[in-house]
UniProtKB/Swiss-Prot annotation:
This is CRISPR system Cascade subunit CasD. Signal peptide: none annotated. GO terms for cellular component: protein-containing complex. GO terms for molecular function: DNA/RNA hybrid binding; RNA binding. Gene3D superfamilies: 3.30.70.2660. It comes from Escherichia coli (strain K12). The gene is casD.
Length: 224
């Protein structure tokens, strides 16, 4: 059995960044590893330039994310996408090299009315304990948000802690069950999997390495 910290990520808008170039800022369908690490880092009060603490956090935790169905007034609310348009004056120098003028255009994507349940557990190399993370989530040092500062939470982050043999069973303790699960750990070794570039390279800002997510469709095993 292993200890799990369970989080709820819900809000009117969320944005979980994907690889991008120039002005288009897409969002993933569920929270990325880099986004979840950033959220935890904010709760713990870790500064962006504190690379040793960020590296320790990254090496200490793994995640499984369940995509939940949102019900309001007994009605199912479908997740939709939103794209907004910005112009930016005085952008970073690396962007200016891509443009013929100082003002750049950006299109930013968001998920609307999405809700996720996240199971977090410690790796064998962890330098922190679940109770430390629980305390930080209950009383964050910096304001947590859902991928971007314009995306506040509408539900407390903390759902609970539990003991379970794997992340799938940990998530079964919290309603609503049945949504697709994306896990950093394969439960049976027979899941579908895909590669995502969402592992932050701590010493190289805004650079990401590739890693794998395992898919449990509808909360059930999916063989390859």
């Amino acid at each position: 059995m292993r200890s799990y910290l369970i989080l709820r990520l819900a809000g009117p808008m969320q944005a979980w960044g994907q690889p991008t170039f120039e002005g288009t800022r897409p969002t993933g369908r569920f929270p990325t590893r880099s986004g979840l690490l950033g959220l935890l880092g904010a709760c713990l009060g870790i500064q962006r330039d504190d690379t040793s603490s960020l590296q320790a956090l990254s090496e200490s935790v793994q995640f499984a994310v369940r995509c939940d169905e949102l019900i309001l007034d007994d009605r199912r609310v479908s997740v939709t996408g939103l794209r907004d348009y910005h112009t930016v004056l005085g952008a970073r120098e690396d962007y200016r090299g891509l443009k013929s003028h100082e003002t750049i255009q950006t299109w930013r994507e968001y998920l609307c009315d999405a809700s996720f349940t996240v199971a977090l557990w410690l790796t064998p190399h962890a330098t922190m304990v679940i109770s430390e993370l629980e305390k930080a989530v209950l009383k964050p040092r910096y304001t947590p948000y859902l991928g971007r500062r314009s995306c506040p939470l509408t539900h407390p982050l903390f759902l609970g802690t539990c003991q379970a043999s794997d992340p799938q069973k940990a998530l079964l303790n919290y309603e609503p069950v049945g949504g697709d699960i994306y896990s950093e750990e394969s439960v049976t070794g027979h899941h579908l999997k895909f590669t995502a570039r969402d592992e932050p390279m701590i010493t190289l800002p805004r650079q990401f390495a590739s890693r794998e997510w395992y898919v449990i469709k509808g909360g059930m095993d999916v063989s390859q």
